[in-house]
Amino acid sequence: MAYYDEGEGDPIIFLHGNPSSSYLWRNIAPNFFQSNRVIVPDLIGMGDSEKLDGVNNKDYNFSGHYKFLCEFLLSISIKKNIHLVIHDWGCGLGLKFARLNSNAIKSGTITLLD
């Protein structure tokens, strides 16, 4: 998964919609660099993230995206005090993550962006 990761402090995870990319957050995320660790991934198959093999790959569904998101967060040691900022397709992924990992979540924000 392609992503950028900048700053220190409690992590803020920005999740974009579908079809979109981390570019959605280009004017918002930098406002938090001085106070938080800001992580902005490109979900699988979007933005600069790798495309999966095969046109009909079964991981291009909600369950597949959720699996990749969880593996990604573990790989960069995101485990507690998480602030989620979610939009569109990222809302479903983020809300499921929050429901199943409520002890790790500090806050959540659902956004409506054009």
Indicate residue ranges for each PLM-predicted region:
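Short, hydrophobic alpha-helix immediately C-terminal to the catalytic nucleophile
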Residues: 26, 70, 95-99
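Glycine-rich, phosphate-binding/catalytic loops in enzymes
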Residues: 29-33, 55-58, 100-103
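Active-site loop/oxyanion-hole signature of alpha/beta-hydrolase fold enzymes
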Residues: 40-85
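Conserved hydrolase catalytic core segment
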Residues: 35, 79-114
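Conserved HGGG/HGGXW glycine-rich cap/lid loop of the alpha/beta-hydrolase fold
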Residues: 4-51, 72
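A general secondary-structure boundary signal
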Residues: 5-10, 63-66, 70, 89, ...
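Glycine-rich phosphate/pyrophosphate-binding loop shared by adenosine-nucleotide-utilizing enzymes
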Residues: 1
